Amino acid sequence: MVHLTGEEKAAVTGLWGKVNVEEVGGEALGRLLVVYPWTQRFFDSFGDLSNAGAVMGNAKVKAHGKKVLNSFGEGLKNLDNLKGTFAKLSELHCDKLHVDPENFRLLGNVLVVVLARHFGKDFTPPVQAAFQKLAQGVATALAHKYH
């Protein structure tokens, strides 16, 4: 569960309604793979990830980024039950994929950077703080199976 004030919920949901999930998702996952290259080991089947241009232009990265952001959006609809919302994904990433749960936090931080880039002055410090809190809540929910 993530505790957002009424103002924070309004800020997050208001901005989320303007997010191009395909564009932002692809960029966020792409940046994760470029900035933290060790995360690429989970995406061997994605083809060429040899440099930033290849990663950012990779159709599979973009498609998976969209999928990731759609899941994040589901979390927004279920703020009071993030652990339940992400239980199956947590189990998959822990038991089958063996993803380091720290990667969830890194992706959340990258998502905040990408949102700031896309929304500029509308991504005020209070909006950033609310998204950072939400990203941490989602990362914690995804890491739940690991505990």
Curated annotation (Swiss-Prot):
It holds the Pfam family Globin. Residues 3-147 form the Globin domain. The modification Asymmetric dimethylarginine is found at residue 105. Red blood cells. The modification N6-succinyllysine is found at residues 18, 60. One of its GO terms (cellular component) is hemoglobin complex. InterPro entries: Globin, Globin-like_sf, Globin/Proto, Hemoglobin_b, Hemoglobin_oxygen_transport. Heme b binds at residues 64, 93. Disulfide bonds: none annotated. Keywords: Acetylation, Heme, Iron, Metal-binding, Methylation, Oxygen transport, Phosphoprotein, Transport. GO terms for biological process: hydrogen peroxide catabolic process. Gene3D superfamilies: Globins (1.10.490.10). The modification Phosphoserine is found at residue 45. The modification N-acetylvaline is found at residue 2. The modification Phosphothreonine is found at residue 124. GO terms for molecular function: haptoglobin binding; heme binding; hemoglobin alpha binding; metal ion binding; organic acid binding; oxygen binding; oxygen carrier activity; peroxidase activity. Hb1 is a heterotetramer of two alpha chains and two beta-1 chains. Involved in oxygen transport from the lung to the various peripheral tissues. Belongs to the globin family. This is Hemoglobin subunit beta-1.
